[in-house]
Amino acid sequence: MSSYRVAQVGAAGAPFEITERTTRRPGPHEVRIAVDACGICHSDAMFVNGALPDVQFPLVTGHEIAGRVAETGDGTGGHWQVGDRVAVGWFGGSCHHCAACRQGDFVVCEELKVPGWSYDGGFGAEVIAPADALARIPTGLSAAEAAPMACAGVTTYNGLRRSPARPGDLVAVLGLGGLGHLGVRFAAAMGFETVAIARGADKAELAEELGAHHYIDSTAGTPVAEALRSLGGARVVLATAANSAAISATVDGLAHRGELVVIGADAEPLTITPAQLLMPGLVVRGHPSGTARDVEDTMAFSVLQGIRPMVETMPLEQANEAYGKMLAGTARFRMVLAHTEAGRAG
């Protein structure tokens, strides 16, 4: 029996430890993936800390997976072949029978499968995933570049393209981290007049490099909403920062019929009153990632526009250090665990 290495968490809040798992064959409608890279998302902390229901320990987290099909199970219909380059993100498969799935809205499936929650994630050299979770990686993206596109990329890209903003509209991106730096790049490439909002004057140069037309320093003294109104008001604010206070502070900067798209997860409540929403007809919407097809669209658009995530790679053995950098906010801008052939063979 062959084996492969994983970085697992033995109990809630425990550090990662390197251990081995026995390779198993994929079941019907599943594929086994040889993982080349896996991004580290802030949402991984919810799994590691046991903050979500039914999280099982020992845990192998990771839902920004890029690799190659190593083996196919029955019923994959010949669509996937050994060697195909694939990505798997937060959308790790759906049930196909709940009300949302029957309406074709698979990403809000009532029994959504998330890697690291429903089955072992990408902090290991192999993953067995449902075939409907697979997105084909296009030529032009490396594994380390493709992995973050399966969650951070698709969430920002989809959040913008499903918003009411149209080319030429003022669109603000709150936060310049793992999601935000991609959000700014996508917004600029989509033809929006792009505003980046972050903390500190030192981020202005980065915002310009990413393609932003304007930069708002949220610590400069002028309220963020006032700064947005001085630019004419935002048609859309894409809130990538996991900070409810910062998200709430943008609402009064929306133009009439504007939309706040929330993708940054924070346990604290938003402080928005009905009065703020009623008169200007504002919309507050949560946006949940995207399907495998959406991931493919994101990657195709990224190749077309020359957009790549800014990543820092580390080997699986340094999972604790890489995860720590993500938590501390010192990553520039997405930590990615890169796997080796040596980690797969036991």
Give the predicted meaning of each segment:
Residues S94-L174:
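NAD(P)H dinucleotide-binding glycine-rich loop of Rossmann-like/cofactor-binding domains
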Residues G264-P280, A292-T298:
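Rossmann-fold NAD(P)-binding glycine/threonine-rich loop
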Residues M1-Y4, S248, A292-G346:
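C-terminal hydrophobic helical "lid"/dimerization subdomain
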Residues L254-A255:
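Helix-to-beta-strand junctions that scaffold the AdoMet/dcAdoMet cofactor pocket
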Residues M1-A66, A129, A338-G346:
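Short N-terminal strand-loop motif that marks the start
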Residues G258-E259:
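Glycine-centered, small-residue-biased loops immediately flanking beta-strands
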Residues R24-C38, A51-A99, A133, P138-A144:
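Glycine-rich beta-strand-centered segment in the early N-terminal region that forms part
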Residues L170-L176, A188-A249:
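Adenosine-nucleotide cofactor-binding segment
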